[in-house]
Design a protein with these regions (language model features):
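Short basic helix-loop element that most often maps to the first helix and adjoining turn
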Residues: 3-22
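Short, basic-rich loop-to-helix N-cap that marks the start of a DNA-contacting helix
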Residues: 37-47
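Key DNA-contact positions within bacterial/archaeal DNA-binding proteins
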Residues: 17, 28, 38, 57
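Short, charged recognition helix plus adjacent turn
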Residues: 50, 58-68
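The DNA-recognition helices of helix-turn-helix-type DNA-binding domains
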Residues: 26, 37, 63-67
């Protein structure tokens, strides 16, 4: 799912710094999430999705479809 969030961020034209600002976090938070060094809890996943401008349910549906 993280790969989908990274691609969505890039498609939205957002840098890690810009996404971090939207979340009230530093760029290092975004980097660690994207590198798999830090996991997101459900609330953080929803916040990141919304900050990128995508529906969190759409990310989940896409991830589920990719595994089947």
């Amino acid at each position: 799912m993280i790969e989908l969030l990274v691609q969505a961020r890039k498609d939205a034209g957002l840098t890690q710094v810009e996404l971090g600002k939207r979340l009230g976090q530093r760029q290092t938070f975004v980097s660690k999430v994207e590198l798999g060094e830090r996991r997101l809890d459900v609330a953080e996943f929803v916040a990141v999705s919304r900050a990128i401008g995508i529906d969190p349910h759409a990310i989940i549906r896409t991830a589920e479809a990719d595994t089947h």
